[in-house]
Each structure stands twice: as C-alpha cells, then as structure tokens.
C-alpha cells in the first residue's frame, strides 16, 4: 500500500516533534465508527485491535457519545475537593456489579496498578502488622502492568526497564503458572500477589487450568492478598465479565481500566474490601482527574451497556466462532491460537513471516492488527 503525501505529512510531524517510543503501522487514522476506522485518505479498515481492549463497546458508541456530550456541557471536572452527583452513582454501580465493597477511582491502568500496590502495602503494615518497609509483593515473569517507575522495576521486558534505575525494591518475581514457585516465594513479609489472569502483552498466555485456584488457596492459608490486573482482560473481553471467573475464584483486589472509559477517556479503578481500603485516608493517595464527573458518567454507562446490549455473551459466542475458524484454516504459519472470547492471540511461525510483516500484509487488506510487542 502506497503511503500518500497527505499521510506522510502527519507521520513526519510525529517523528520530528515527538520521541520514537512507539513504532506505529504506517497509516494515519482520522475517523471511526463501530468496528470501522478510516484514514485521512478515506480508506476504510476493520479494527481488529480495539485499542488493546479499550474500545470494547465499539468506536463512538451512540449512548456513550450522548453521555459525553451531556456531561461535558454540564460539569466535566472539579477535582476531589468536592462531592459531585456523578461519582457516587458510578461507585455504587461498579461495586454492586463486581461484588467488591469499595472502589478507588483513578485514570490510567498504570495508575490503578500503583494504587493497588500502595493499598496492599498499607494494609500489610496496618492490618497484617508486617515490619515497616519490609512488605513484599509477588509478581510473575513475563508480566505487563504499565511503564511507571515502580511498575517497570518488576518488569521482565528489558526495553521498558534498562537505564531507568535505580529500581524500586519489594517485588519477588516468580514463574507464571507455577504453583510451587508461588509457595516457595511466600514469607512472613508477603503482603500480596499481583498477577494478570491472562498475560496480555506476553502473548495472550493462559496459566495452567488450576493455577489461579491454587494461588487463591495459598493466599488464604498465608493471609496474603490476591490482586488481579484485569485492565485488558476484564469487562467482557474473554466472554465473562472477568477472566478470573473462568477459574471460579474471587480475588481480594481487582484492577480495571481501558474499556471502563468506553473508548473516550482514561478511566481506571482499584476494587477491594473495606478491610483493605479503609487505610487510604485523606492525603494518602489521589488524583486531580480521578473520579472526575465526565469519566464517572461515562464509566457508569459503559458498565450498564455490557449487559443491556449483551456484549459479554456476544464476546463468548463470536470468540468461539472466530477461534474455531482460525484453527480450521490449518495454516502452516499459525503455531497456536490462544485466548478466550474476543481476546485472542495468534502465534505466528517466524520461519514463514514476522509479526510485523504480517501486520503490514493485513493492513494492505484493510485489517488493522499488530503484535502486542511495541518493538515487533
């Protein structure tokens, strides 16, 4: 596909005025509706990326557009220095829908992960009575939870970690999917485990069938919080409201983001019990935009639409169809198809084609899809 001068103009502007911390596909997008996206030359594409699960409702969902317009014209931001008539209804909706007692609203997924880490540490010191500054959190190799300074400290991705030190201590990394590794890492100083139920950027990697239930039992036995990061896997993406439901367990804390903002703005949250979140007193944590009226209104409506429009069940049905169709191709370039619902990953045999080259080939055929790795 030839890149037009019109598209080159926008690409050059990004290259000249911004750092090279992403490697985008060579297409300049300007419009979207539902599952379709158009570039600046009005070429039409099927969006197979969904902004890494942030646009699960489809682009410019009319119900969310209405909420966005109405709320932005009424009250968009106040800071948490005041009560609003949107935050309470949103918090009530999300806690009732998820079964957690409390929700601490933030913006980006990484912010919510940081919130979970701080909450777990404070609980460890004030409730579990771990010695000051000794709390540890067990994480998994191959994880991706964001790129803030603390989070990259326990990343396995060298490109996210190298030359950004000194790194934050207090994290113990274990093999993803290994029950024994988790058991061996537990000490009296263990505050929590922090895992993705399915590793997204790692390549849609699912753990062994009973691993999450094993981790749940280990945490119960040792008075350790089980915290799951479902920023990408949550809110219907895997054919259930949450990916952990496939394992028939419940975590002590849950991190959500991406689709929570309906594809309009960053909205995230850390959900847990009163026992954990009671220790977050005034001044301990916060964000100017966290829980803002506009984000709260959109998040509340985005949650309601999951059930009103049957999006979770549709993800299950269409995901099964899509996965089976991919498997029936019996293609020599496909090594494995992984995932559940509409969160699928196709591992490509590099002997035949690289992930980046496949993305370019799909682009020529008007399909937008790319590798989870920012370097591929």
Q: Where are the predicted features?
A:
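Active-site-adjacent loop/helix segments that line or gate small-molecule/cofactor pockets in enzymes
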Residues: 1-33, 81
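A structural motif shared across PLP-dependent enzymes of the aminotransferase-like
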Residues: 28-36, 53-69, 80-92
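Amphipathic alpha-helix from the class-I
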Residues: 70-74, 275, 294-313, 327-330
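PLP-dependent aspartate aminotransferase-fold enzymes
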Residues: 92-192
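Active-site PLP attachment segment
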Residues: 149, 240, 245-279, 291-298
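Catalytic PLP-binding core of fold-type I/II PLP enzymes
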Residues: 205-239
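Conserved PLP-binding catalytic core of the aspartate aminotransferase-like
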Residues: 319-323, 332-361
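Conserved small/polar residues in nucleotide/adenosyl-binding loops
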Residues: 369-376
């Amino acid at each position: 596909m030839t890149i037009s001068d019109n598209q080159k103009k926008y690409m050059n502007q990004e290259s000249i005025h911004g750092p090279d911390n992403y490697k985008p596909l060579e297409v300049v997008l300007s419009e979207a509706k539902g599952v379709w996206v158009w570039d600046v030359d009005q070429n039409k594409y099927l969006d197979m990326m969904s902004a890494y699960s942030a646009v699960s409702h489809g682009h410019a969902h009319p119900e969310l557009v209405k909420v966005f317009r109405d709320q932005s014209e009424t009250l968009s931001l106040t800071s948490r220095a005041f009560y609003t008539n949107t935050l309470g209804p949103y918090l009530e909706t999300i806690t009732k829908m998820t079964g957690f007692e409390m929700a601490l609203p933030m913006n980006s997924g990484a912010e919510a992960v940081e919130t979970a880490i701080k909450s777990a540490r404070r609980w460890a010191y004030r409730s579990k009575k771990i010695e000051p500054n000794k709390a540890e959190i067990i994480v998994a190799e191959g994880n991706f939870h964001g790129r803030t300074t603390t989070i990259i400290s326990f990343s396995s991705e060298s490109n996210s970690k190298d030359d950004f030190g000194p790194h934050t201590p207090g994290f113990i990394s274990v093999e993803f999917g290994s029950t024994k590794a988790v058991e061996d890492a537990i000490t009296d100083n263990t505050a929590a485990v922090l895992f993705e139920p399915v590793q997204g950027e790692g390549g849609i990697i699912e753990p062994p069938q009973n691993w999450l239930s094993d981790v749940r039992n280990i945490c119960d036995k040792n008075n350790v919080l089980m915290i799951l990061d479902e920023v990408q896997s949550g809110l219907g993406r895997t054919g259930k409201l949450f990916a952990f439901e496939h394992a028939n367990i419940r975590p002590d804390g849950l991190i959500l983001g991406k689709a929570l903002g309906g594809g309009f703005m960053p909205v995230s949250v850390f959900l847990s019990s009163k026992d954990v979140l009671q220790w977050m007193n005034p001044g301990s944590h916060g964000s100017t935009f966290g829980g803002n009226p506009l984000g709260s209104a959109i998040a509340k409506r985005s949650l309601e639409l999951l059930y009103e429009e049957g999006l979770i069940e549709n993800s299950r049905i269409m995901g099964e169809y899509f996965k089976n169709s991919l498997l029936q191709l019996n293609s020599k370039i496909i090594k494995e198809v992984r995932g559940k619902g509409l969160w699928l990953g196709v591992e490509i045999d590099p002997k035949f084609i690289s992930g980046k080259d496949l993305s370019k080939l799909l682009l020529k055929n008007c399909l937008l899809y790319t590798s989870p790795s920012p370097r591929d």
